[in-house]
Amino acid sequence: MRPVEWDIVLKLLEIVARQDGKIRPIELENIALAEGVFKSKTTGTPLAHSPRFYYRKALEHLGFVENISGKYFISKSPPILELISKRATIDSNKKRIIAELIVNNEDCKKNFVSLFLLDDKCKLEEIQNKSAYVIAKSYSIEHKQSSAKRSLKPIMLTSPLLDKNISIDTPDRIHAIFWGIRRWLLDVEAIDEIITSPKAGRVIYFVNPSIGEQLLLLEFKRFLRRYFTPNRDWIKIYLPDFYEYIIFNSQMRARTSVIKNFLVNFINENKSSVIPIPISGTMLNAEVKFEKQDAAFKRSFLNFHNIGYVAYLNINKTLI
């Protein structure tokens, strides 16, 4: 299980459908190379053997194809047949189908998805409506190899609501679970993640796609009521606190981009009653633990071209 581009997976599936039961795995690679499917999106050069191998394994592992006597056959399950009934390009419906395949896969469930499940038999739609969240943190251990010690950066996945955790403590498991299964679900927009504090870790959650700005407005006003007192006309709120409120204390788990769009619109529609306060450079550049963690941390804030990143809002009580 390694990172893959789902549009490439669908093109491979289309090739197998054309040659159903007639080609071997290596022949699929050769056809995909000849048709320009196995190309790097950044450099345009053909993919090396290892990533091509991982693409084939993703096809097999998630049940897109069956390897029978060394030849590839298309799975006859309805979701797979639906994927190949249209153009081999990714869209929201195909992302949903792929997300369901990942969620229902036993290895994916055991090593990642189970941490979110309030019921082991939950389907994707039920998980999106009601599920636990997971916190990912790195830690250090000593690992002996060839009489020499080397420092590893394993990752602990913790589900506070379920009191469960999974330790990803080897390079293979880190690649397979954190950069494999997690990345798969991110890319099909089934999950999202945010870092509200570098020390708190990366918060990962299943997105409820039905949550829009009207529902977020109701939830935002509930959040604001926790801070207002009768003798105060204004209150300062910290935006990551609102994200935590949404993710930890409600089932209104919208995508971070949806929450940010709501906040931007709320500010623009109430300019006389909402004052954005920018974040300091020191806080924005706080030390992070994961590769590319800074991008997830910045997602907690709003970015306005005229004032930069905004971490706080001063809000007048008339808006409650």
Predicted regions and their residues:
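Donor-sugar nucleotide-binding helix/loop cap in glycosyltransferases
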Residues: M1-L284, I307-L319
